[in-house]
Amino acid sequence: MDFFRIVENQQPPATMPLNVSFTNRNYDLDYDSVQPYFYCDEEENFYQQQQQSELQPPAPSEDIWKKFELLPTPPLSPSRRSGLCSPSYVAVTPFSLRGDNDGGGGSFSTADQLEMVTELLGGDMVNQSFICDPDDETFIKNIIIQDCMWSGFSAAAKLVSEKLASYQAARKDSGSPNPARGHSVCSTSSLYLQDLSAAASECIDPSVVFPYPLNDSSSPKSCPSQDSSAFSPSSDSLLSSTESSPQGSPEPLVLHEETPPTTSSDSEEEQEDEEEIDVVSVEKRQAPGKRSESGSPSAGGHSKPPHSPLVLKRCHVSTHQHNYAAPPSTRKDYPAAKRVKLDSVRVLRQISNNRKCTSPRSSDTEENDKRRTHNVLERQRRNELKRSFFALRDQIPELENNEKAPKVVILKKATAYILSVQAEEQKLISEEDLLRKRREQLKHKLEQLRNSCA
């Protein structure tokens, strides 16, 4: 990045017109990168963005840290370009003050003021001045380093506003367009840069405050390694995370093992989802509040032990916060998946109970059916047996007309009758044989008689 160079003309002509000239560059992009750091009006509401995202005003304890007058944290990384890291490189470029058309004034226009302050705040010199020399151990033992709540957002805003006010007052005091005016303005600019350098020299090395370097928090899918020794010290990640933020303000650096940092818009969407969705567990209801609290912009930061996530966040607390003072809820809520699972288990239990209840009924019906079938078959068999007895009774001459004859009598009489019948049969058979023999004899005798007659 080019620098805004200021050179004092040693002997300018008395009739030299005052004008302002800058190097050819795209100032719009540079101004957009540092626009949140510039406040034209000292009475501007610095917390308008927080109020729009439904955040609380700064806590009363925040004013305690204004006495330290620290610059915005986290500090910006030094430039990697060769020859740009030393403040001695800050040269000044010739520029002349342009007089007004009315001839009486000589003050800068609003555009010139914006460009000048943009150059002063966006230069590599200022970015480099945010980091002190790592070899300098003067401020390492400072008590501020050991305080986990050290902050500089409000102090930096007050410092910038005071410097701009003094800078504008110094330009307004010099009323006549003469060489002394240009000399005073240039000296004021030099003093402003010196003040920034002096204030920046009181900063500390970020490697001392952050023993575990952080990855780039601006990337949406940051997945840092779980091993802290795997991180390599990189100050460019801090610089890129500060400059690549959409609003230019220092974003909270979150080192988390599972979830990436959330912005205020994400927290608002999660809060809306929390209001719309009811079928969630208590832990899931608390999670969006915690994530929105960690992602909400605040003015202070704090560090945690190495085993816990290292979070830098400002001290504005979201209104949508879990009330830990409230009594614990007695109602037990289950997630949707767990409810479905419980319902399915309940249905399976009911089905099993129904099966257990219906199995005796089915067995009884089967037994009844079998018994009924057996009874039918047995009745048929008895009926057939009865008819057989009746038929047998009808065949016995002694029991032919006795309808009340018992079965035993029928069987006995039937047996006696059969034996008698069989005996008679044998007798008849023997008689038949005798008769046949007699017939044969008679036939033979008849044949003999016919032969004798012939």
From Swiss-Prot:
Record motif UBR5-degron, residues: 370-379
Record's subcellular location: Nucleus, Nucleoplasm; Nucleus, Nucleolus; Nucleus; Cytoplasm
CDD domains assigned to the protein according to its UniProt record, in alphabetical order: bHLHzip_c-Myc (cd11458)
Protein name from the UniProt record: Myc proto-oncogene protein
Biased composition (Polar residues): 350-362
Superkingdom to which the source organism belongs: Eukaryota
Gene this chain is encoded by: MYC
Annotated crosslink Glycyl lysine isopeptide (Lys-Gly) (interchain with G-Cter in SUMO2) location: K67, K158, K163, K313
Residues covered by region (Disordered): 216-310, 349-375
GO biological processes: chromatin remodeling; chromosome organization; DNA damage response; G1/S transition of mitotic cell cycle; intracellular iron ion homeostasis; MAPK cascade; negative regulation of apoptotic process; negative regulation of cell division
Composition skew (Basic and acidic residues), residue ranges: 281-293
Residue positions with a glycan: T73
Alphabetized GO MF terms: DNA binding; DNA-binding transcription factor activity, RNA polymerase II-specific; E-box binding; protein dimerization activity; protein-containing complex binding; RNA polymerase II cis-regulatory region sequence-specific DNA binding
Pfam families membership: HLH, Myc-LZ, Myc_N
Post-translational modification: Phosphorylated by PRKDC. Phosphorylation at Ser-344 by PIM2 leads to the stabilization of MYC. Phosphorylation at Ser-77 by CDK2 prevents Ras-induced senescence. Phosphorylated at Ser-77 by DYRK2; this primes the protein for subsequent phosphorylation by GSK3B at Thr-73. Phosphorylation at Thr-73 and Ser-77 by GSK3 is required for ubiquitination and degradation by the proteasome. Dephosphorylation at multiple sites by the PNUTS-PP1 complex promotes MYC stability by preventing ubiquitination by the SCF(FBXW7) complex.
Keywords: Acetylation, Activator, Chromosome, Cytoplasm, DNA-binding, Glycoprotein, Isopeptide bond, Nucleus, Phosphoprotein, Proto-oncogene, Transcription, Transcription regulation, Ubl conjugation
Keyword Cell inner membrane listed: no
Origin species: Pan troglodytes
Cited function: Transcription factor that binds DNA in a non-specific manner, yet also specifically recognizes the core sequence 5'-CAC[GA]TG-3'. Activates the transcription of growth-related genes. Binds to the VEGFA promoter, promoting VEGFA production and subsequent sprouting angiogenesis. Regulator of somatic reprogramming, controls self-renewal of embryonic stem cells. Functions with TAF6L to activate target gene expression through RNA polymerase II pause release.
The bHLH domain, residue ranges: 369-421
Region spans: Leucine-zipper: 428-449
Biased composition regions of type Acidic residues, renumbered to the chain: 266-278
